């Protein structure tokens, strides 16, 4: 019902806010994976190269996904 959707929306917004405010994290491995992160200073999804491990949630495989999650 409505109550469940409200709670679900609240938690999604909390997760979304936390992920999108995390700093870009390349990671400690030496891979070379093109990714996008949300830059909270510019308000835009920006490309970066991810090393393959040790990243965080602000790491999206596509620009479209970054924009959808972070509303950029």
Curated annotation (Swiss-Prot):
Top-level taxon in the UniProt lineage: Eukaryota
GO CC term (a single one): nematocyst
Similarity annotation: Belongs to the venom Kunitz-type family. Sea anemone type 2 potassium channel toxin subfamily.
Function: Serine protease inhibitor that inhibits trypsin (Ki=50 nM). This protease exhibits a pronounced neuroprotective activity on Alzheimer's disease model. It enhances cell viability by 39.4% when neuroblastoma cells are in presence of the toxin component beta-amyloid, but has no effect when these cells are in presence of 6-OHDA. It induces an effective decrease of reactive oxygen species (ROS) level in the cells treated with oxidative stress inducers. It also protects these cells by inhibiting ATP-induced purinoceptor activation. Its binding affinity to P2RX7 is moderate (Kd=43.3 uM).
Pfam families: Kunitz_BPTI
Record-linked InterPro entries: Kunitz_BPTI, Kunitz_BPTI_sf, Prtase_inh_Kunz-CS, TFPI/VKTCI-like
Name the record gives this protein: PI-stichotoxin-Hmg3d
Keywords per UniProt: Cleavage on pair of basic residues, Disulfide bond, Ion channel impairing toxin, Nematocyst, Protease inhibitor, Secreted, Serine protease inhibitor, Signal, Toxin
Range of residues in the leader sequence: 1-14
Main subcellular location of this protein, as a coarse class: secreted
Organism classification: Eukaryota, Metazoa, Cnidaria, Anthozoa, Hexacorallia
Temperature dependence: Thermostable. Complete trypsin inhibition at all temperature ranges (25-100 degrees Celsius).
GO molecular function, one term: serine-type endopeptidase inhibitor activity
Misc. comment: Negative results: does not show activity on the eight potassium channels tested (Kv1.1/KCNA1, Kv1.2/KCNA2, Kv1.3/KCNA3, Kv1.4/KCNA4, Kv1.5/KCNA5, Kv1.6/KCNA8, Shaker IR, and Kv11.1/KCNH2/ERG1). A synonymy between H.magnifica and R.crispa is controversial.
UniProt xrefs under SMART domains: KU (SM00131)
Compartments where found: Secreted; Nematocyst
Positions of the BPTI/Kunitz inhibitor domain: 20-70
Taxonomic source organism: Heteractis magnifica (Magnificent sea anemone)
Residue ranges crossing the lipid bilayer per the database entry: none
PROSITE patterns: BPTI_KUNITZ_1 (PS00280), BPTI_KUNITZ_2 (PS50279)
Intrachain disulfide bonds: 20-70, 29-53, 45-66
């Amino acid at each position: 019902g409505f109550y469940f959707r409200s709670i679900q929306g609240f938690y999604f917004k909390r997760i979304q806010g936390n992920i999108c405010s995390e700093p870009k994290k390349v990671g400690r491995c030496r891979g070379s994976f093109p990714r996008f992160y949300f830059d909270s200073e510019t308000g835009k999804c920006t490309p970066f190269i991810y090393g393959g491990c040790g990243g965080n949630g602000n790491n999206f495989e596509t620009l479209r996904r970054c924009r959808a999650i972070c509303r950029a």
